[in-house]
């Protein structure tokens, strides 16, 4: 047990008996708790022991383990051992307050979904066909990637949402916050092709994307169509709306150093947890978009 004092060693032995007899924990759990206590004791400052450790010391220990790459599960186990130790010392009258009470382990950030590279997206968007379903689906996928829309945002678009002459789409995002997002030339062309078919579908709904019977497309239907085209184009990844949105963000950030512009294009309050949300004028957003997005450039005459 390293450089522990005799009192610490005695307390740990009593703690082990307490876990077995009174808490009736399994031998495996008891072993894990003792292992964790021995580990964290080596991370405490030299003048701090398991008997006089404070809340700030436990916070520092957890932060160190987090930085070392300990998994959330391992951090949770360590925290449980620390809390049980505090409860034991409290029960024995050796401390007045459990310093670990209320502590929570640092959470590791969830990995972002893998984006599709430009070549894969280009291949996906090269679908051909003149039937209404193909034209509609191509327009949806182009718009997802062109403007980084959320699934709910695209599904809620109406015929009046797109300003074709200005190459803009008016989007109602989370919290009913409206924003204007540029639309690339490829997406505009695909939308115009779909619009010809859309106008021939009897429909009382003003939705931009509808079924053959004139009903607004559901979220599930849009997801299903994206997955279908990913399979038909023989892509190695499953295609879904958020993957296109994430690819939009990734490719924009790779081409542009303007994090705040991309943040606003996405409609995020925070793209980075440390980045304070700032509002940019639309002219600047359009300029960044036009110079950075792979499919925003005007098509050259062939």
Swiss-Prot record:
Domain Tyr recombinase: 111-290
Keyword field: Cell cycle, Cell division, Chromosome partition, Cytoplasm, DNA integration, DNA recombination, DNA-binding
Compartment(s): Cytoplasm
Any Pfam family: Phage_int_SAM_1
InterPro entries the record matches: CB (IPR044068), DNA_brk_join_enz (IPR011010), Integrase-like_cat_sf (IPR013762), Integrase_catalytic (IPR002104), Integrase_recombinase_N (IPR010998), Integrase_SAM-like_N (IPR004107), Recomb_XerC (IPR011931), Tyrosine_recombinase_XerC/XerD (IPR023009)
Residue intervals of the Core-binding (CB) domain: 6-90
Active site location: 150, 174, 242, 245, 268, 277 (o-(3'-phospho-dna)-tyrosine intermediate)
A biological-process GO annotation: chromosome segregation
Record-linked PROSITE patterns: CB (PS51900), TYR_RECOMBINASE (PS51898)
GO cellular component terms given for this protein: cytoplasm
GO molecular function: DNA binding; tyrosine-based site-specific recombinase activity
Disulfide cross-links: none
Family: Belongs to the 'phage' integrase family. XerC subfamily.
Subunit structure: Forms a cyclic heterotetrameric complex composed of two molecules of XerC and two molecules of XerD.
Function: Site-specific tyrosine recombinase, which acts by catalyzing the cutting and rejoining of the recombining DNA molecules. The XerC-XerD complex is essential to convert dimers of the bacterial chromosome into monomers to permit their segregation at cell division. It also contributes to the segregational stability of plasmids.
Database matches in NCBIfam families: recomb_XerC (TIGR02224)
Name of the protein in question: Tyrosine recombinase XerC
Source organism of this protein record: Shewanella sp. (strain W3-18-1)
Upper classification of the organism: Bacteria, Pseudomonadati, Pseudomonadota, Gammaproteobacteria, Alteromonadales
Gene name, Swiss-Prot/TrEMBL: xerC
């Amino acid at each position: 047990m390293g450089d522990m004092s005799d009192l610490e060693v005695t307390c740990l032995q009593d703690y082990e008996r307490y876990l077995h007899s009174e808490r009736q924990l399994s031998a495996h759990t008891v072993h894990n708790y003792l292992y964790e206590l021995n580990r964290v004791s080596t991370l405490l400052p030299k003048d701090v022991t398991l008997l006089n450790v404070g809340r700030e010391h436990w916070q520092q220990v957890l932060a160190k383990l987090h930085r070392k790459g300990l998994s959330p599960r391992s951090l949770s186990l360590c925290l449980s051992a620390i809390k049980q130790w505090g409860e034991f010392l409290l029960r024995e009258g050796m401390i007045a307050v459990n310093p670990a009470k209320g502590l929570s382990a640092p959470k590791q950030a969830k990995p972002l979904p893998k984006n599709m590279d430009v070549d894969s997206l280009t291949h996906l968007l090269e679908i051909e066909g003149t039937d209404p379903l193909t034209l509609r689906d191509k327009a949806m996928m182009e718009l997802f990637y062109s403007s980084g829309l959320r699934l709910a945002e695209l599904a809620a678009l109406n015929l009046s949402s797109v300003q074709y002459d200005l190459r803009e789409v008016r989007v109602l995002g989370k919290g009913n916050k409206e924003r204007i997002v540029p639309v690339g030339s490829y997406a505009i062309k695909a939308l115009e092709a779909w619009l010809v078919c859309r106008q021939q579908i009897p429909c009382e709904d003003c939705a931009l994307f509808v079924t053959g019977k004139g009903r607004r497309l559901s979220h599930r239907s849009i997801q299903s169509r994206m997955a279908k085209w990913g399979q038909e184009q023989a892509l190695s990844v499953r295609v879904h709306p958020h993957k296109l949105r994430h690819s939009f963000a990734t490719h924009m950030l790779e081409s542009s150093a303007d994090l705040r512009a991309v943040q606003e294009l996405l409609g995020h309050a925070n793209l980075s947890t440390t980045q304070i949300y700032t509002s940019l004028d639309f002219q600047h957003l359009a300029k960044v978009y036009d110079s950075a997005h792979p499919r925003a450039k005007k098509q050259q005459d062939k």
